[in-house]
């Protein structure tokens, strides 16, 4: 049979083709409805544990032990609030954030938002490239340059999933996320952290961030938690569930989406906390307080734990983390392009363009700076995402506060105060981080 590339975008990556494709029986039991609605939150949670977050968590654990675990907890709670706003917007309006931005803002403003959103997609993909390339380098012993080149072939994975259905994609994501979780669970069993100290780390403490260094890392954790592309992604993929148009059905959908979001981000919280706990138990407790790179963490695990299994699991988790973002990045890119420009191209072309643009800084960085470029480029990707986040978060809050748009699903005043408070906090934290990186 002759092979040919698809001429049009195909499910499960194209928002119009998967909208309402997953049936949710309103007469089913509550537990069955929860299971049918589960999935969009899982895809969103992948952005909360991508390779861009690893370096910050590793440095925080190795330098300050368990003391910044409460920051991971608070940042995850903030993410839950923001993502619940996203799911509510998508269900209440039947449109995603990009579509609504195109409709409600002037053409120049909408085009600027589109450009910034596309830059954030490329920055996110850069972190995925670096994470996967580093995993190939650590697990296979190949050069970083060759590892970066290997990541170009993930476009074939996008092609392999054409016409497979959205639930198939969610199942694959579940396997990858479960792989990450199992790897870190086994890691913690091998390292045996002192759990009473771990529990104390979740207790909020101003003293723990009283100095400039821990405050810097705390802001880094907060600033890297909410990913701008996730806001567009979530408002779109929550519409994959087939629900009634009546008010009662939408209220039930909002409740089910909230459960899906909180449960999925709780899983991401456990993974991010596990990374910090791993670094604290393996490195800080043994006096290695200067571990700030993923490569250093990988190479130190074997001698400290006393076996090769720990480092192998670490590498496998890193690969699963980077690879899972391939799919969510493709969907988010389609949402942004279709929403802002009303333009649809084949998904494999979309993936190829984004990955090609992400490979350029990765190759140049490794060529000029060597292996040390990985950490610097990961930081760069987080800076770019921090710059873009307010431009996605602001319209989200404005729209969910708009009674004419949201109807009975409009934010109540406590939610408004909380949302604007998070906007000021996250934007201020990101601005402070950018100033620190600039100097």
Residue spans of the language-model regions?
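Flexible loop linkers connecting adjacent transmembrane helices
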Residues: 17-22, 56-61, 84-109, 134, ...
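Juxtamembrane transmembrane-helix boundary signature
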Residues: 44, 71-104, 113-119, 324
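Extracellular/periplasmic helix-exit of transmembrane alpha-helices
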Residues: 80-92, 238-248, 266-296
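Loop-to-transmembrane helix boundary motifs in multi-pass membrane proteins
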Residues: 108-110, 145-148, 311, 315, ...
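Transmembrane alpha-helical segments of multi-pass small-molecule transport proteins
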Residues: 114-118, 139-161, 179-183, 348-364, ...
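Membrane-interface loop-to-helix entry segments
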Residues: 150-151, 161-191, 389, 411-416, ...
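Hydrophobic alpha-helical segments and their helix-loop junctions in multi-pass secondary transporters
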Residues: 155, 177-206, 215-236, 396-404, ...
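C-terminal membrane-solvent junction of multi-pass transporters and transport-like membrane proteins
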Residues: 172, 348-356, 377-426, 430
């Amino acid at each position: 049979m002759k092979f040919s590339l698809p001429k049009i975008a195909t499910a499960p990556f194209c928002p119009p083709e998967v909208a309402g494709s997953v049936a949710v029986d309103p007469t089913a039991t509550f537990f069955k409805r929860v299971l049918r609605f589960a999935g969009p939150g899982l895809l969103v949670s992948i952005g909360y544990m991508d390779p861009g977050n690893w370096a910050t968590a590793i440095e925080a654990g190795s330098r300050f032990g368990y003391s910044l675990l409460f920051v991971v907890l608070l940042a995850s709670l903030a993410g839950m609030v923001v993502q619940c706003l996203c799911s509510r917007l998508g269900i209440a309006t039947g449109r995603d954030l990009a579509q609504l931005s195109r409709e409600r803002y002037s053409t120049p403003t909408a085009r600027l938002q589109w450009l910034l959103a596309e830059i954030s997609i490329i920055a996110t993909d850069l972190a995925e490239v670096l994470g996967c390339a580093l995993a190939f380098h650590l697990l296979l012993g190949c050069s970083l340059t060759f590892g970066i080149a290997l990541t170009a072939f993930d476009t074939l994975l996008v092609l392999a999933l054409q016409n497979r259905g959205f639930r198939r994609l969610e199942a694959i994501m579940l396997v990858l996320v479960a792989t990450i979780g199992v790897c870190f669970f086994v890691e913690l069993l091998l390292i045996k952290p002192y759990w009473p100290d771990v529990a104390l780390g979740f207790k909020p403490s101003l003293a723990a961030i009283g100095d400039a260094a821990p405050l810097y890392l705390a802001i880094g954790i907060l600033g890297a938690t909410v990913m701008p592309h996730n806001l567009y992604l979530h408002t779109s993929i929550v519409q994959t569930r087939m629900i009634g148009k009546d008010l009662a059905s939408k209220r039930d959908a909002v409740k089910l989406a909230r459960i899906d979001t909180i449960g999925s981000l709780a899983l991401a919280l456990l993974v991010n906390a596990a990374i910090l706990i791993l670094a604290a138990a393996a490195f800080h407790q043994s006096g290695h307080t200067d571990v700030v790179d993923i490569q250093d963490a990988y190479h130190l695990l074997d001698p400290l734990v006393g076996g090769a299994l720990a480092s192998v699991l670490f590498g496998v988790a890193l690969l699963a983390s980077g690879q899972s973002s391939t799919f969510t990045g493709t969907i988010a890119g389609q949402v942004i392009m279709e929403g802002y420009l009303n333009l649809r191209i084949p998904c494999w072309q979309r993936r190829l363009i984004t990955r090609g643009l992400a490979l350029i800084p990765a190759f140049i960085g490794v060529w000029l700076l060597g292996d040390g470029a990985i950490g610097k480029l990961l930081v760069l990707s987080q800076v770019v995402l921090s710059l873009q986040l307010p431009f996605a978060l602001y319209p989200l809050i404005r729209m969910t506060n708009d009674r004419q748009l949201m109807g009975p699903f409009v934010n109540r005043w406590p939610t408004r105060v909380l949302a604007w408070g998070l906007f000021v906090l996250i934007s201020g934290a990101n601005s402070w981080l950018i100033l620190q990186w600039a100097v």
